[in-house]
A protein has these predicted regions:
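Conserved class I S-adenosyl-L-methionine
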Residues: 13-46
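Acceptor-substrate binding/catalytic loop of class I
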Residues: 55-70
Length: 138
């Protein structure tokens, strides 16, 4: 964030996405339910600290999974003001296959509802990714 703040001019826009602390739980539930037992220690480390260290054969890099409440203060500390914070998956994540088959007004109604609810802070903890839209102060 410091580098973004350094190179962005005053009033410039920043779009920053994070993977949330709970994304690995959602991934495990959907794709590999046995991970809750096989990788319990790693999962608990992520839930507690957000830190995940790469392990041979696992296929994911070192990562920090942020708690949703950490993003706005981090951005403010680096000179940005929040314009929007959106849960990228929204409330229809994991059930989107059925909705993707819709068309016309019915599709649009679901898109609009999902987008609106994605801005609700209560939904942010259930999202896998958050999109921060901000402006550099000054």
């Amino acid at each position: 964030m410091r580098e973004a703040a350094r190179v962005l001019r005053s009033g410039g826009l920043i779009f920053a996405a994070i993977i949330t602390r709970y994304a690995p739980v959602r991934y495990a539930a959907k794709h590999e339910p046995a991970l809750i037992l096989k990788e319990r220690e790693g999962l608990e480390q992520i839930l507690g600290s957000g830190v995940s260290l790469a392990r041979p054969g696992v296929g994911f890099t070192n990562a920090y999974f942020a708690h949703p409440s950490d993003l706005t203060p981090l951005m403010e500390q680096n000179g940005f003001e929040m314009l929007d914070l959106i849960a990228c998956e929204g409330v229809v994540s994991m059930i989107d296959d059925q909705l993707n088959g819709l068309a016309g007004d019915l599709w649009q109604a679901w898109v609009e509802l999902n987008y609106r609810l994605g801005k609700d802070p209560a939904v942010h903890g259930a999202a896998e990714h958050l999109l921060y839209v901000g402006r550099k102060k000054g």
